């Protein structure tokens, strides 16, 4: 595993689950760019036997359908060595193929299955959640060497459908982990690991601007000043930039402008939003 900044408690807990002698169903969630996928890849790298990432629904030309997601899952199976199989038509078939694959390669050692961006796979009327339930309840939870790790940036989906599930997946998670942005101290540690020398005042400013998100902090160039790095990371159109920051600025500035323009006699929260 490469050097991971911070995340000491998270790494320790994930390693503890990795070494347990029982089936584990782990859900990791948190906002975008916070480092969920990176952390999971690094901790479970040596034991990961299957990895799949759901297709983003945010396509400019079309919205991803159940057929698209199933085809992508089929390609992941083939990529991992499942030759001679027909593309699944339902999620029940897809998870059954995954069962067959895991059974075929089982040598008794820990099997980590990582499904990234799980919420994206649950398209309308796809039966995805029911199939996931059948996979875990009917097969996975009896496999003492299986560790199913799911991840997603759509935190509300993870919370509603896994953590607070009232159906067949009620209480099935063995670990739920919310990954938070870096603290101020971890941000300083991150900059030091990248050879970026800044005063603590500038580190604090960077933290206030970028919020301790590792993906954004990684844009910093040690040859640039704080102002130059912020320009490159956020504002320069010709450079790679975290566009989410720009959209967040626009949203908050619009909200502030709406509140600022509310007449003084309009004091209720509801009335403020009517002007937004």
Predicted regions and their residues:
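Phosphate-binding site recognition
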Residues: 1-276
């Amino acid at each position: 595993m490469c050097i991971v900044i911070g995340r000491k408690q998270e790494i320790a807990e994930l390693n503890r689950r990795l070494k347990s002698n029982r089936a584990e169903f782990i859900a990791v969630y948190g906002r975008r760019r916070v480092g969920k996928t990176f952390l999971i890849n690094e901790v479970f790298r040596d034991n990961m036997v299957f990895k799949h990432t759901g297709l983003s629904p945010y396509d400019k030309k079309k919205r991803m359908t159940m057929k698209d997601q199933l085809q992508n899952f089929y390609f992941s199976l083939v990529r991992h060595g499942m030759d001679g199989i027909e593309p699944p038509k339902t999620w029940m078939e897809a998870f059954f193929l995954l069962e067959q694959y895991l059974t075929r390669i089982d040598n008794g050692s820990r099997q980590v299955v990582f499904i990234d961006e799980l919420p994206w796979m649950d398209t309308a009327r796809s039966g995805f959640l029911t199939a996931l339930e059948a996979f875990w309840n009917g097969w996975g939870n009896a496999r003492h060497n299986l560790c199913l790790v799911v991840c997603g940036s759509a935190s509300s989906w993870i919370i509603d459908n896994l953590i607070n599930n009232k159906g067949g997946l009620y209480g099935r998670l063995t670990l739920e982990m919310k990954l938070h942005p870096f603290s101020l101290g971890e941000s300083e540690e991150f900059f030091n690991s990248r050879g970026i020398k800044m005063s603590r005042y500038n580190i604090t400013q960077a933290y206030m601007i970028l919020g301790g998100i590792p993906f954004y902090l990684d844009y910093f160039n040690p040859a640039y000043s704080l102002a130059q790095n912020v320009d490159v990371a956020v504002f320069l159109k010709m450079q790679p930039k975290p566009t989410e920051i720009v959209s967040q600025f626009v949203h908050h500035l619009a909200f502030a402008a709406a509140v600022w323009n509310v007449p003084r006699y309009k004091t209720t929260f509801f009335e403020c939003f009517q002007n937004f």
